[in-house]
Every structure is written in structure tokens, then in C-alpha cells.
Swiss-Prot record:
It comes from Homo sapiens (Human). Residues 453-1297 form a coiled coil. The lineage of its organism: Eukaryota, Metazoa, Chordata, Craniata, Vertebrata. This is Citron Rho-interacting kinase. It catalyses: L-seryl-[protein] + ATP = O-phospho-L-seryl-[protein] + ADP + H(+); L-threonyl-[protein] + ATP = O-phospho-L-threonyl-[protein] + ADP + H(+). GO terms for cellular component: cytosol; membrane.
Amino acid sequence: MLKFKYGARNPLDAGAAEPIASRASRLNLFFQGKPPFMTQQQMSPLSREGILDALFVLFEECSQPALMKIKHVSNFVRKYSDTIAELQELQPSAKDFEVRSLVGCGHFAEVQVVREKATGDIYAMKVMKKKALLAQEQVSFFEEERNILSRSTSPWIPQLQYAFQDKNHLYLVMEYQPGGDLLSLLNRYEDQLDENLIQFYLAELILAVHSVHLMGYVHRDIKPENILVDRTGHIKLVDFGSAAKMNSNKMVNAKLPIGTPDYMAPEVLTVMNGDGKGTYGLDCDWWSVGVIAYEMIYGRSPFAEGTSARTFNNIMNFQRFLKFPDDPKVSSDFLDLIQSLLCGQKERLKFEGLCCHPFFSKIDWNNIRNSPPPFVPTLKSDDDTSNFDEPEKNSWVSSSPCQLSPSGFSGEELPFVGFSYSKALGILGRSESVVSGLDSPAKTSSMEKKLLIKSKELQDSQDKCHKMEQEMTRLHRRVSEVEAVLSQKEVELKASETQRSLLEQDLATYITECSSLKRSLEQARMEVSQEDDKALQLLHDIREQSRKLQEIKEQEYQAQVEEMRLMMNQLEEDLVSARRRSDLYESELRESRLAAEEFKRKATECQHKLLKAKDQGKPEVGEYAKLEKINAEQQLKIQELQEKLEKAVKASTEATELLQNIRQAKERAERELEKLQNREDSSEGIRKKLVEAEELEEKHREAQVSAQHLEVHLKQKEQHYEEKIKVLDNQIKKDLADKETLENMMQRHEEEAHEKGKILSEQKAMINAMDSKIRSLEQRIVELSEANKLAANSSLFTQRNMKAQEEMISELRQQKFYLETQAGKLEAQNRKLEEQLEKISHQDHSDKNRLLELETRLREVSLEHEEQKLELKRQLTELQLSLQERESQLTALQAARAALESQLRQAKTELEETTAEAEEEIQALTAHRDEIQRKFDALRNSCTVITDLEEQLNQLTEDNAELNNQNFYLSKQLDEASGANDEIVQLRSEVDHLRREITEREMQLTSQKQTMEALKTTCTMLEEQVMDLEALNDELLEKERQWEAWRSVLGDEKSQFECRVRELQRMLDTEKQSRARADQRITESRQVVELAVKEHKAEILALQQALKEQKLKAESLSDKLNDLEKKHAMLEMNARSLQQKLETERELKQRLLEEQAKLQQQMDLQKNHIFRLTQGLQEALDRADLLKTERSDLEYQLENIQVLYSHEKVKMEGTISQQTKLIDFLQAKMDQPAKKKKGLFSRRKEDPALPTQVPLQYNELKLALEKEKARCAELEEALQKTRIELRSAREEAAHRKATDHPHPSTPATARQQIAMSAIVRSPEHQPSAMSLLAPPSSRRKESSTPEEFSRRLKERMHHNIPHRFNVGLNMRATKCAVCLDTVHFGRQASKCLECQVMCHPKCSTCLPATCGLPAEYATHFTEAFCRDKMNSPGLQTKEPSSSLHLEGWMKVPRNNKRGQQGWDRKYIVLEGSKVLIYDNEAREAGQRPVEEFELCLPDGDVSIHGAVGASELANTAKADVPYILKMESHPHTTCWPGRTLYLLAPSFPDKQRWVTALESVVAGGRVSREKAEADAKLLGNSLLKLEGDDRLDMNCTLPFSDQVVLVGTEEGLYALNVLKNSLTHVPGIGAVFQIYIIKDLEKLLMIAGEERALCLVDVKKVKQSLAQSHLPAQPDISPNIFEAVKGCHLFGAGKIENGLCICAAMPSKVVILRYNENLSKYCIRKEIETSEPCSCIHFTNYSILIGTNKFYEIDMKQYTLEEFLDKNDHSLAPAVFAASSNSFPVSIVQVNSAGQREEYLLCFHEFGVFVDSYGRRSRTDDLKWSRLPLAFAYREPYLFVTHFNSLEVIEIQARSSAGTPARAYLDIPNPRYLGPAISSGAIYLASSYQDKLRVICCKGNLVKESGTEHHRGPSTSRSSPNKRGPPTYNEHITKRVASSPAPPEGPSHPREPSTPHRYREGRTELRRDKSPGRPLEREKSPGRMLSTRRERSPGRLFEDSSRGRLPAGAVRTPLSQVNKVWDQSSV
């Protein structure tokens, strides 16, 4: 019941108080939409139009057949049918308007430019489809749009003229804005605008959005397409279909996504993704304004990316993804504006903040509508649409075929009641009432009087107004002149101010830039100084470290040197002691020589005495003997001393050897010291490298030059030092050579001394011999004395012997003399030897001194050399730093060189093959060259040998000369020694002679004894001498004792010396040990130093990284500082400008004050005048109020009079019509007799030209009516012809061919699709077969005139039977027969009950009415086309018959940006294997296409996709996505990228034709060799093949045992024995959709029956039934059905916490059941409502995962439902927002192996995400499907993905493994996943083609092996045309049938024409018998390799329909027996 409020009164009370007429008038006003006391926002929708809408709805609902059976309803309909028809005619309708063009097309509506036929006015009409609006009532808000347009008075919103509706559509007619939209304006300016233009349009957009907000609405879809430009250049905000009304808190609550993804605010996405309880306000519109501002300046959206999910992710993380490019330069105010809009909801600017923003400081917000716009569109006419992009007209606007009307009251039209609206309704009602009231005669006199008075007053006021207007014109003219001058001055002033401001801005920017540059310079200087300080400090540290290291090494070296020095000192002391001993020996030798001289002197004395004794005789001989004895003793002593001297010389040689060992140890120590110095030099080099590296960072070029100079200098120094080293080494070598020569000389001298010692010993021996002779002589003297004594006795004897004694004495004297001469000679020799010995000792001493000096000099030189080496190495190590940097660069170059070398090696391998022949000749030449080279080498070697021999000869000659010298010297000495020996021999001979003589004389002495006595006196004298000799002998003995004591002392010293030597040896050993320990310490210290160096390097790298980060921070801070300084400068400049303005304002204020004083006086005068006028105005207002009340009374009276007048008029019209009819009747009666009389018995013909005598008015009306009808008929006929021609032309243009006819290789489906478009037409409009295949030009010529059109050939074939669709839940993922997209499992689908074709519910209206069309009919119709074409003489082919031609208009993305900038209409031509794109249809002969696309690549692959995902084209209207097809090319090489081309077809038939034609061209690019190679490959097994009536519709499989597989079909449950090759039916169970075995209960869980009920079957009963299958009668199995779970489409079973659970999914809910062990049955525990049907279920250890619109997790403890994906993980934003882009869950797969952490793969329609058990991402990369998936299956480690005509296999690697997963693709016609196979890693697939069904076992590893052979990953999965895989099964059969000869007829050769020849020969196949117990011999295929090419969506029209069974009466070809081979290993 309606209640209308009038103030505070109750309507019932008011009705009781007011009269009925007043209430009727008020009710009339309410119906006119003008109820009193109601605002515009409170207006009720039930105006006159609303009540009419309600009346129309009531009438339509009552007209339903079900309600017409009610009597009262049928009476009501019959009663008011005419009235309703008349009212509907009076209502506005689409027929009142003529459509001129289409300017816009959206998701739910399209906008047309129309012209009102009656008035010619141009409007924009928005057409909306009611069904789409009702289906998306949460997205499209038509009521809000109508209310906003009708109630708005804002100039920023278009004015609504009319709103009306019909049965299928809603219409909004509003004012037309011909300037286009803002997107077109951006395209005009190349997507970027200046800031001045942006300022203007943003200001107007802000006012427009604010006007919507003031009305209480939020727009929610603000984008450039919804901002129009009117004819004056100002903007209008349109498209309020997404607007929402705000509540009292000014908030909006909505869950579904509203708006365009690129312009959505983050809070909208948050609410959309939440639980629906969140709200958002009008801030979302200001976010969209910010996005538009960003897009206007940068030419792109700030957050847009490839897919909507990524776009949503970027919007949610806008703080990270909002970036401002450097180009173009943008003012800081504008950047601040964008940042203030694209920010958080709380910080976002509102309307007040935007108005006060500095960017809009120059905007006059109150007069912006009157300001001139920057762009005014140029219009050619009122309906010009050139400023709009031409959109594509969608097929949904056209009227859909009639559907069956629902029975009963539906209520579908109730939401549209009150939609109608007419703008001029209220004004017209009032004016009509006034006019009708004025026609009434009531109160005419009073009105005339008042009219005269008012006319006079009006005349006076008009005169006054005329005078005032003249005065005003004069004043306006003067003011305009002044304003013109003023404006000119102001323009000049503004120009100067702007120039000044620009200059000031430039100055400020220059100042800031200078300051920033100065600061950066200072900073750079500081950095340079810091770097220098750091470098110096580092250099100092390195030097300090090197100094410390050098000190340590010097200390070690000094310690070693000190030890060596101590050893040297000790050795020198030993040498000194040895020298001292040698001096002692020499002194003793001198003493012995002196003693020898003394002895010689005494010997001479003795000789003198002997001479004296000769006279005396025997005394002298005795003395001589004593002397000889003494001489012998002296010789012995000399020999002992010589031995001691030899020992001393030996000790000296040992000391020399020890010294040499020490020198060698010293040299080794020096070498080790050099090694240490080299290492120190390396550390010094590291330090130098660091210093040089830091210098290179500062001064690159100077450092390079200095480094080069330094390198040259150091090289020179190095060469200089090396030369010095060489000189010093040479000098050392020379000194060592001198030393060696000296030592050799010393050794030679020692040898000479030894030889001389030998000579001395020989001489001593001679002295001994002489002593012995002396003793013998003394003995003789004694004897003589005795004889003299005897002679004294006898004088006779004395006398006789006197002479003899004298003779003997003389002889003795002679002998003494001889001996004295010999002793003198020996003494001379001894003196010579002593002199030589002294010379040798002196030379030895000098040589030793010289050696010491050389050693000291050598040490000094070595020290100096080491210092120079250290300095040189220090300088060299400084270069090594720079060299290491060069080496790093060299390593990079070497890496590049290595890459080039690898390429070079590859090239070399190729060259090696080409140079094989040349190498043979080269080898021969090489052999010849080698022979020559050998000869040359031999000659050269001989030359070298000769030179070496010459050198050796020279050396030998020198040595020989030296040896000769030595030999001469030695020989001379030997001659002297031999001379001495000869003398000794002569002396010995003389002694022997003397002995003989003595013997003779003794004989004489005996005779002269007497004479001896006389000599007694002489004897006494001799005795005295003997006494003297004895004393001398005692002295000699004493000396001998002294020599013995000295010998003992020397022995002691020798023992001490040996002890010292042993001690030195021990010290040497300890020294070696200490040296080894020192070496170990050195190695340890070296390792410590290296470790410290590594740590230092790591610290340096870390510090360098930190330094880089600090530098980046410093740079960012400096940039910010520069920006702030610029802002500061600008603010200062603004402050100065404001100060100047303030001063000017003050001056202006002063002038204004003065003017104010003047005006105040004038105001006082005017106030008085106004006061008088106010009094007059008050009186006039009073009179006006009086007139208003009188006017209202008159209106009421006029309305009453009008009602009465209408009644009277109706009565009068009825009377007049009755009287007219009576007159006509009477006139006809009067004329009738005359006609009869004239025509009776007369044979004349009637004259049709004679008019019938009727009244004139009636005839005129009748003639006018007939003319109008004829005109309408002509127009209707012309319109119909035009429509037919236009439709036929469009269809012909879409699929016409060129002048050639199609080749027989063209698929029959393409011709059948062309046939279908002709079959579904009516016969009178059906084109001929020739016209369908003829070129468009000939068809246009044929239909150019009506005569030619009527002469067309009308075929008798016609088929127009509509489908009987039933909308239900889809139980199997398949392909839509219309749009070629996926019909997903568990979603709503439309299925024809007759032909079983399936499509989307929205696509069912577009499917051609070809239900039940037999394939033979289409084939016959196609053959008729071919015959007509072949017989046509005008269709001669000019091109090769193998080419296929198709052309038509389609759309391609603008600028190849996936539709982000719209679509361009292009003319597409398929010519041969190329797709050519042109701008227009009329192509000239030489015109080149805009773009080309090659379908048959020589080194790549091309795939055709009949459907694409919505996320690929995020900015494309969702209504256009089903019409898009995609072509992809993938080259095999990585040098060229792939290519993608999207095409937008105008309709579904066009899309199907294009897809079929493109696929046929791509498929025709293969060659026979590739087919043969493909046929030879093997993969998997074909388990079963069913054909014709034996075909089963399989749904699922389950391995029941090792041999049996259960098969669920639409016909029931079957068991397949893979070993016995039999298929057995299990009775008692209906259609089976899913099977699962519960092993704990030994039950089979399945979905079965027509009701799709969940039921349990005992496993034992199934086994029993299989065991009894051979019996004629089997017991039926009765399943245990869950009555509460019916209509189930999916279930999952598992074990959670040791409890058996079932999760069953139904269309609107999910049911959870748990097994109760006490009751032994499953009980329902929870029912959960779902917004979308569940598509997947997975059991975990503690919960259940399900997929509906999102992935949810059900906790099995509390049975709570929550989202599975973690919202806090921003990387999962594409998956979280997937539902908003129509990408829903498909499957859940657990991919972790046993024992690993749980990991799941969540599969969506377009991608897959890896997550862990907590819903968080577990892997960084997602899986992308290469095409639209149907189903998923996982068999570890392979993921199987079924597509339309292919299977994709992906190897899921472990989580730790890196790299992309391996993929393989198999071409399988219509694959359907059945279930897992018996073997691991394999699945069962069902493949249906034509009337055959094949069950395939596909194994993952086989697929991988075959797939990876040519297809590595998605990018390499496409083979080249020369290496492409085998054809599909359909293509193979088609080509085999076409190429194979006709089979012989007869009973022995029954063959099916479509069976491949390869499967026929020698093979038998048994047909399946449906009777139980009869085994089925399944097909044993040879395991033909299924092609691994990419998918080619066939897009055929009959493919889906052919899957069902043929209708009754269709003829089937009998099966032939075929025997095939089958491998059981992989089942």
C-alpha cells in the first residue's frame, strides 16, 4: 500500500477532510511527477510512467498461457488489450529513432547515435540487454544510472531526454556529445598532454565527480572512456552503470569487483577480496582521478601490467610500484597532486583539498564552464562521429531466437518497473491544462479586465525596459571598449609577469643548480681529499706494515748474520790460532835452521878441527863421526818438524773447507733472504696496487699515463739494477776465481814445500850417512890410535908406517874438504828452501788478508745489492697492483676470448672438415720441410759443436800452457834435485872407495903399529875434542827432549782443535735445526700474513660495498637536497611574487577605499531609491501571490472543465461517427439499385477507375491511409532487401575465397561451415551454391538490382530446427561449440537434449539452428557447392590450386599492446600460407600490406588458438574476449623472438571459419617424409578401441587389481581385464561418474545413477559378479545410496585422525561425512554453502582443501572454513585476485615425495602456484599452461594436463632443484582423463574422434623421452617443418582415405572407408558384445607415436555434435576384423 506524505497530516485524515475533486487534482499532480511537499531526491518512482510500466507488466504476466486459463484473468486481458496496445503505441520506442552509427560498446550495453524521426533531433541512445543486467545484478546498476541522469541538473552530466524499454532491452536517450571521449583526445595528442591542458580537464573532471558525490552516489568507474567532450569543448561524465548509492555514513558496501582494473582503488580491492563486510567511500573516485592524471602526463597507466592479477598486485603494493619517469619533466605541484591522490585512503585529498591545491591556483572554479576550452572539436554535422573510435558491434545486441516462455508468473520484468521517463512531461501537462482551461468560458470577463490592466502595465514596463536597454547598450558599449583596453593591458601585464616569473624561475633554478653543483663540487673535493687521505693513510699503513715486516726480516737476517759472524769470528780465531801455530812452527823451523846453521858452523869448526885432526889422525876422524851423528839427529828433528808442518797445512785446508761450507750456508741464507724479500716485495706490490687502484678511481687518464711512465722508469731502473747485479755477480765471481786461484797457488806452494821437505829429508838422510861415515872414521881413528899405541911399542913399526899414516891423513883431509863442500852446498839449498818457504808463507798470509778483504767487500756489496734489490722490488710491487687490475681486465677479456675461442673452436671443427684434403698436401710439404730442417739443424749443431770444441781447445791450450810452465818449473826443480842425488851417489861411491882403501890401509896400519905410538900425543888432543863433541851431543839431546815436549803440546793442541771442530760441527747442526725452525716460522708467518691479507681484502670489499651504498644514499640525499633547494628557491620566488602582489593589492586596496568612499555616497542615494523600489516590489509581490492563488484555482477549475470537456468530446465524437456511418450506409443503399440495373444481363467489363460514391471526408482519409500503407510497405520492402543484402555481403566477405576454387586438401569442415551459414537461412533468402563460393564482387553484381536478386537460384535444401537446450552442471570439461573456449568441470553448461552439443549458457543463443542435421546432409550440400563451382564458367582459377583464400574485416590490437589502447579495424586476407593485414578493403595492385604473418615457417612452428584467457587481454571488454583468436609463431633458434597476433572476429561463425582455415593451412605445411618418421615412433599403448554402436561414453577408471581395471561409463560399470583382453559388464549399477575404493571397509565409493547419487558398493559383490560373468543370469548389485547426498558431481575420501571421511560436492554446497564405527555407516557432520560449485577436493592429515571461487581449507576439528592462501604473502596476489579475472581453481595436487615437507600445486585456469601446508609460497616461479587446460592429473613426478586436442606432460622437480621443468606435448584428439594406470607414472586417457573411442595408457617417462628428443621446454617444443612430429589421427585418416585406392567390393573385403590402411592388413578385431560373459577382444595398436606438436584447436562445427550417437535412421558402416599388436609392459 502506498502512503504519500503531505506535511504532518495523515493521508486518511486528509482524505476525510478534503473534497474528492481536490484529492483527485492532487492525485493527478502526483501522477505527473510533481507531488507537493517532496524534494527531488524523495520523488517516488511511481509517476505516470511508473504506473504505466506496472500496468504493462501486469498485462504481460496475465497474458501467460498458464494464467489465461483463469477466467477473470482472460477477461481482463481481452478487455484491456486494445487499450494497452494504444498506450504502448503512445509510449516512446526504438521505432521512433533512426540509428545513425555506433560510438561505444561496453560489458552490458552499447551506445548508438540516433535521430528522432519526427523532429530530426540527434541524441545518444544507450541500449542495455535485460537478461545481462539481471544475470549481473551485483555488477550493473541500471536504476542508479537512470536516477542520476533524470534527476541531475549539473552541467557536467548529460541530460536525459527519454527512458523506455521493450521486452528485451532498456533504452536511455540523452543529449549527444560529439567531441569524442578523453581517450580519443589522448590519442590525438599521442597519449601525452601538456600541463595546461591537464589542469583544465582535471579541474572540470573534479567538478563533475563532485556533482555526482553531491547527489549521494559514487561513480566507481571513472576512466578516460567515460569522460566525453561536448560540442563546445567541455567535458561530460557518463556511464553511471557502476555507480552505487551511499548510505547515511557516506559509505558503500560491495563484494563483487566493480570498475576497470587499471583504475581501481586499493580499498576497493581489499573489500572485494574480503568477506564482504568492508566498506569504502567516495575516495575511490579520487584515486581514479589520480590514475587519469598520471596517464595524461606519462601516456601509460601507473599500475597496468600484462594480466589483471598482476595489476591488482601492483595496486595493492602501490607504495613500491608507483614510479615517476624522468621524461617528461613534470612540475613539482603536479607531482604532489598525483602523490596526494595515489596514496592511502586516509591521506587522500578530498574535493576541498583539490580546490585549494597549488596546481589549480590559476583555475576560476566558479566560471570554468564559461572559460574557453583548449580544444574545440570540429564537426561536419550534428551526427558527426569522427571523434570517436569505431567500436565493434557485438552479436548480443541482435535479437535472440525465440525461447520457450516460462509457465506461470516469472516476475522478471518487475525490477524494470518505473524505468520509463520523459523529460518534458511535467511542462507539457501544465501547459496543456492551462490551454485547455483558457478555452473554457468560465470567468472570462474578470480575466479580460485583469488582462487589460496587466497589458497596460506591461506596455509601460516595456517602454521603461526599452529605454533602460538603450541606456544599458550604450553603457555596455562603453564598458566593452574600456574592458577591451583593460584586457589588452592586462594581457600585456600578464605576459610581462609570466615572462618575469619564468625568468625568476630560471634564475632560481640556475641558483639552485649552481649551489647544488658547488655543493657537489665541494663534496667531490672532500671525497677526493678523503680518498687521498685514505690512500695516504693506507699507503702509510702499508709502508708501516712493510717496514715492520722488513724490520722483522732484518732482525731475523741480522740474527742469522750475527750467528754467521760469530761462526766466522770463531773460524777466524781458529784460523788465527792455526796461523799462530804455523808461526810457531815456522819460528821453530827457523830455530832449527839456526841450530842447523850452528851445527854447520860447528861442522865447519869440526872440519877445521878435522883438518887439524888430519894432522893428528884419529881425533879428527872421531870428531867427524860425531858431527855426522849430530847431523843425522838434526835431520830427524827436521823430519819431525816437517811432519808437524804437514799436519798444520792439513788443518789449514780443513779450516778452508769449513770456511767454504760456511760460505755456502751463507749463500743459502742469502737466497732465502732473497725469497723473503721477494715475498715482501709481493706485499709491497699489493700495497702499491691498492694505492694505484684508488688513484685510478680519481684520475684515470693521469694515472694511466703516470703508470706507463712509472713502468718505463722502473723497467729502466730494473735493467740498471740488473746490470749492477750482473756486474757485482761478475765481480764476485771474479773474486771467487781469484780466491780459487790463490788457494790453488797456496796448495801448489804447499805441494812444493812438501817436495822440498822431501828433498830436505833426503838431505838429512845424506847428513846421517855422512855422520855414519864420520863415526866410521872416528872408529878408524880409534883403531889408529890403538895402532899408534902398538906402534909406540915398536919404533920400527912406527917408522915404517909413518908414511902410510901421513898418506891417510891427507886422504882424510881431502875427504873432509869434500864433505865440507858438500855441506856448504846443502846449506845453500836449505837456505833457498827456507827463503821459498818464507815467501810461500808470506804469500799465503797476503792471500788470506786479501781473501778477508774480498769477503768483507763481498758482504758490503751483497748488502748494498740486497738494499737495491729491496728498493727495486718495492718499486716493482707497486706496479703489480696496477698489473693485477689489468689482469682482472685481462681475465674478463680472456673470458670473452674464451667464448670467442669456443666459437672459434666450433668454427675450427667445421674448417677441419673442409681442410682435410689440403692437410695431405701440407703433410707432404711438412715432411719435406722437416727433412730440410733436420739437415739445417744438423749443420747448426755441427757448427755449435765446432765452436764448442774450439772454445774447449782454446781453454785446453791455455791450461796446457800453464801446465807447461808448471812442468818447466817442476822439471827445473827436479833437475836440481837430481843433480843433488847424483852428487850423493858420487859421494857414496867415493865412500865405498874410501872404505876399500881404509881396509887396505888397515892392513898397512897393522904393519905400522909402531908409528901409532908416536901419535899418542895427538890422540890426547883428539880425546879432548871428543869430550867437546860429547858436550855438544848432550846439548842436542836436551833439545831433542824439548822437541818431544813441544810435540806433546802440539798433540794436545791437535786434540783441542779436533774437539773444537766437533763443537763447530754440533753448532752447525744446531744452526741447521734453528734454520729449519726459522723456515717453519717463516712459513707460518707467511701463512698468517696471507690470511691477514685475505681478511684485509674481505674487509676492503665489505668497506667498498658499504662505501657504494653510502654513496648511493648520499646521491639520493643530494638529489633530494637539490629538489628541496629548487622548491625553496621556487617558494622564495613565489614569496617575492606574492610580496609584489601584496604591494599591488595594497595599492589597489587604497584606490578601492577611495572609490569606496565615492561609491558610499552613491550608495546612500541608491539606497533611498532602492527603498522606494522595494516598497513597489513588495506591492508587486503581494499582487503576484494573489495572482498565483488565483492561477492555482483557475488550473483546478480548468482541469475539471477539461475532464467535462473530454467526456462531452467523446460523446460528440461517438454521435458524429454514428451519424457518419448512417449517412454512408444510406448513401450506399441509395446507390445500390442503380448498379444492379446497369449490370444486369450486361457483359461489359467493370471500370476500376470509377470511384465508389462515399463521403468526401471518408474517401480522403482512406486514400491517405492507403498511400501511407503503400509507402510503409515500400520502405519495409526496401529495408528488408537492404538488410538481406547487407547480411549476405557481410557473410560473404567473411568467408569468401578469391577467384580460385578450394583444393581438395582443404578440410571438409571449412566448406561445411560455409554450408551451415546458408542452410539456416530461409529458402527465399538462401543464396545459391555458386554465389556462396563466388567472389564478393560477382555476388554484389548479382544482388545489385531486384530483378537479378529474384533470378537467384533457390536451393531446396533448408534446415532450421532449433536446439533443445537444458542448462545443468557440467560433469566433464569440454570445449564450447560456439566460442571454442573451455566449458569447465563443475560449471553451468547448456546441452542439447537431442544432438548432445554443449556450450556456455550465454553462447547457446548464437548456435546455428542445425539440431539433428545428419553429416550426409552437410556433405551432400557441400558437394553441391563444389559441383556448382566446378561447372561455373566464370570461376576460372588464376592461382595454384593448392592455395586457400579467405578475407574479411577483423580487428587487431592497436600498437600491438594486447588491446590496452583499443582495437583497430583492419582488412585481413588469408592468401596461401600468409595472413596479410590491410587498412582498407579496396586494395590496389601494388599496395603492400601493413603487416604479414607467415603460417608455414621453414625453421619454426605456428600454433592457432581458438580461445584466449581474459587475463591475456586485461583491458579488453569481457564481452569481446570470446570473439578473439590467437596465432603464435615460435622459431627454433634463439636469434629471433616469437610472435603473437590477436584477431577479433565480428561473430562466432566468422571466428570458426577463420580458425578452421588457419588450422588447415598450418596442418597442410607438412611433407610425407615427416609423416613417415612420425609413424615410425612409438609411445604408450592403445588399450581399447570402440566404434559405432559398440562405443561407450567413458567417465572414469580405477585399477581394481593387477589385471582388472574398473571402467565407469554412462552405460554402467564395466571391468576390463588387461591380460585376457575382455570387457565385462557389471549389472545393477547405472551411469558411473567417479569411483574410489575404501580399502579399510572393502567398499567401492562412487557417484552413480541419473540422480548422481553418492553410493557404496561391496567389493566382494563386484568380485562375485565378475566371477559369475560367464553365467547366463547374473545377480544385480544393489548399491547403498546416501539419500541426503544426491546431485553430487565430485567427492573426495581420506583418513583424518584415524577416522574415515568423505567430502561430497554439490552445486551449491559441500557435505562432510565421517564414518561411525558403532553404527557402521557414514554420518553427515557438516554442510557448507558455497557461492560457486566445488571443482576440486584434497585431503590432508588434518584438514580438507576445496576449490570453489577460491581455495578454502576446512578444519576437521571445528569444521570451520577459511581461505587457504596467505593474504599477507604479496607474491600470491595473482592467485588471491584470480577470481576477479575469471580464473577459478581447477585442481589441487600434492607434489612432495614421501618423507618430505608437504607441498601443493594449486592449479588455476591460466597458471599454477606452489604452496606449503600453510598456504604460503614455496617456490618463486609459477607454472604457466601453454594453452587452456581441461583437467589435471599427477603421477609422481609427472603432471598431466589435458587440452582440447593435446596432452601436456610436465616433470615436477624437487623443491631444491633449480631450472625450468621439462615439458612434452602430445597431439591427441579430444583427450579425456579417466584415472591413474596400474603402473607407476602412467594414466589412462580416452580419445574420441568421429564415431570411435580409444583408451590410451600414457606413461610419463615415455612421454618425456619422446618429448625431450625434440622439445625441451615450452620454447623448444615446436619443431621445424622439416622436423615436425606426426599428424593427428583425424589428419592421418583424412590423408589416408584421400590417397588410398578404392577397396575391392565383395564379402571377402568388408572395409570401412575411413579406416586407415595401416590398421587393416592382416589384423583382426572382435566387436564388443553387450551380452555378459562374452569377452571382448580389445584393439592392439602398434603403439603409434602420438604427435608432440603444439595444439591446434580444430574449431569444427560438427566435432562436438559427432561425439553423441547418431539419430535414428542413420546408416552405420559395419566394422571389419582388425588384429593389432599390443605391448602389456606399460599398462
